[in-house]
Amino acid sequence: MSVLFEPVTLGELKLANRIVMAPMTRSRALADAIPGSDMVEYYRQRAGAGLIIAEGTAPSACGLGYCRTPAIYSAEQIAGWQRVTEAVHAEGGRIVLQLMHVGRAASQHNKPAGAATVAPSALRANTQVFSDSHGLVDTDEPQALTAQGIQEVIEHYRQAALNARKAGFDGVELHCTSGYLPMQFMASGSNRRNDAYGGDAAGRVRFAKEVIEAMAGAIGAGRVGFRLCPGNPYNDIDDLEPAQTAAALCEAVAPLPLAYLHIMRSPLQGLDAFELARQHSPHALILNDSFDGPSANAALASGEGAAVSFGRHFIANPDLVERLRHGRALSRFDRKTLYTPGKAGYTDYPTWQAVAQEVAQ
């Protein structure tokens, strides 16, 4: 049998197979960053994955910055997510929540009134974000976090992990790449601090380390994972030593019995992120590298990691696990509907069986 379909345990997470649905922003949350019925159906359809990592979700109002993205700091948001987790669990699935604080990669047009845009240093990201009200806009000029502000953000993450468990999630993942707040602290280009949270790699990874420690202390380390992509330049990230930075974080959290490290292939030539992770992290690896079925199985069979994650393939193939199991053709997603409101391009992709039945008729 293909290794892909063997069960695996990651910390406290028992997976029926080694196929993980990667977290993907889809911009379908309702007003006030509340998950709605379309999100319930979307995740329910994909519950065949051994593990779903639900989309990046703000731990606080300050953590928001994109349009129609969810959060988990209010009672209404927790209730919305609870409907999602109940639907996934009813199908026999497992689901964790990716916590994503966008930091400076934000626009006030996408935030509640009074929610500040913060960063390790007062340096604006040279990029734009979309807003429903104003279209493409420049990112905000961020406020540099004070020492007290850093502790407040860490507490927001800790409480968000507790809220996630209250909502029924099996665990949480810290988003440490794509130019969001943890990565802004980690990268030398966006972190110009001269205190304990800046300077060398050990200082720059301290924020992410303390967030992971806080979440592990709140819900148990075996229910916490983190995601890395060394050298990812997205959202105007520049780091002079991406390999050393990633290694420093892996080593800093190595004493914690975390569930997993979700490691993405680096876009930088000569930087083998998977090998770096194996050398510097004791944690089980979820690999992400634009896999198809055969390449994913080969990676697992060779011992490169414990599981593999798929992103794009899960968009248009809600039954991806069964398609891979039986070698069936994969549908292609419509790029135009990736971030548009409503069911189109979200919950209306048919299963292979549904297509076959329609053809037969």
What feature does the model see in each segment?
Residues 1-361:
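Flavin-dependent oxidoreductase catalytic cores
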